Amino acid sequence: MRDLIRRTFSRFFLILAWPFRMIVKPFTAIRTFINNEPDDTPLVDVFAATVEQPSLLIDHLEALRRHILRALVVLTLAVLVSMAFTRYILEWLSIPIGGLESLQAIEVTESVGAYMRVAFLSGFTIALPYIALEIFAFLNPGLRRRERVTLLMIIPIATGLFITGAAFTYYIMLDPALDFLLHFLGIETAIRPSNYIRFVTGLMFWIGIAFQFPLIIYALAALGIVNARSLIQGWRFAILGIAFAAAAVTPTIDPVNMGLVMLPMIVLYFLSIGMAGLATRGRSRRQAKVQHEAGTSDLKD
């Protein structure tokens, strides 16, 4: 009887501790993996081994399943936590139009839908760094030390750029956009919660994604696809492309709001040129180091 009670309590505490162990495990994996070098097996040999031994693919899928499960657990917890602050977030988002009392719900479930949308997006934003860490933990065994450190640095930088883009949308771009839309042709507009929240959160999301442009250029330059010189030479075409992108993202057709979107994107483009130069320089140094080591080994032979 005593053993049964002990086993029952042990299993109970294991179940209680399982979510916390699942959360801590990726951070432990990061510390362990960051000092291990990957196996330099050619990609063709890897595919051949997978075909010959399907169990290898099953092992990778099982590892991916564990990472996805942990990410979903953290996302669910983040959404539940954010639900306690969702009303305050809704009030903050509705400040540009005079508060929540300025919204008019037509459908019965409209307010609930807007509430759940903000709760999910807030929880996703909170959980996004952890989800990125789970992706990193899955890819980590095949990365070199320098690549691991670079990815770990990119995660907070990407998060900061996204938050900067969302803040730029809310504090600078949203007021003139709403002023144009709500007073267009002098027609009185009844603002619905679902439409307004979808409009604001969608605009903040896509502008936040647009602010990731320097990181994308840095990655392409590190892979040798682009370089700073080609970006400088093609700046006119880049500005033209930015104009089309701003026209697609901007919710209005007036040049003021389009210019508000274009200006930071142009600044980000020229910032990307500097980051591309850094990435190209680092890539050249690594290639020179590899060639030097190869030449030294040939002389020894």
List the model feature ranges, each with a label.
Residues 1-301:
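Membrane topogenic/interface segments and analogous intrinsically disordered interaction regions
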